[in-house]
């Protein structure tokens, strides 16, 4: 599924985006963000992040730097919740 979604974005980049004026208000561009989000977070969450980003790409939003959030390490969360009891 990831390959299909990324392939669709790459088709957009190659056959549509390059022939239209640059209008993305963000860096990285929304299409580059979408690819990175899907690669980092998978098809479902990555698509959600990409759609959320695209919905902000309009003239009434200031835009700017907006990077894909890093993937949370599930092991890091569980390490904090484990308590070790020392018996004396």
From Swiss-Prot:
It comes from Listeria monocytogenes serovar 1/2a (strain ATCC BAA-679 / EGD-e). Its main location: membrane. Residues 69-82 have a biased composition (Basic and acidic residues). Keywords: Cell membrane, Membrane. Transmembrane segments: none annotated. Residues 68-88 are annotated as: Disordered. Could be involved in insertion of integral membrane proteins into the membrane. It is a peripheral membrane protein. This is Putative membrane protein insertion efficiency factor. It holds the Pfam family YidD. InterPro entries: Membr_insert_effic_factor_YidD (IPR002696). It is found in: Cell membrane. Belongs to the UPF0161 family. GO terms for cellular component: plasma membrane. The keyword Cell membrane applies. It comes from the Bacteria.
């Amino acid at each position: 599924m990831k390959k299909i979604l990324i392939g669709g974005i790459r088709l957009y980049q190659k056959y549509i985006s390059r022939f239209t004026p640059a209008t993305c208000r963000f860096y990285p561009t929304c299409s580059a963000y979408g690819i990175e989000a899907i690669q980092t977070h998978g098809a479902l969450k990555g698509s959600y992040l990409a759609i959320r980003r695209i919905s902000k790409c309009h003239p009434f939003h200031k835009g700017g730097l907006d990077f894909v959030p890093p993937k949370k390490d599930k092991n890091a969360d569980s390490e904090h919740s484990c308590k070790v009891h020392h018996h004396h």
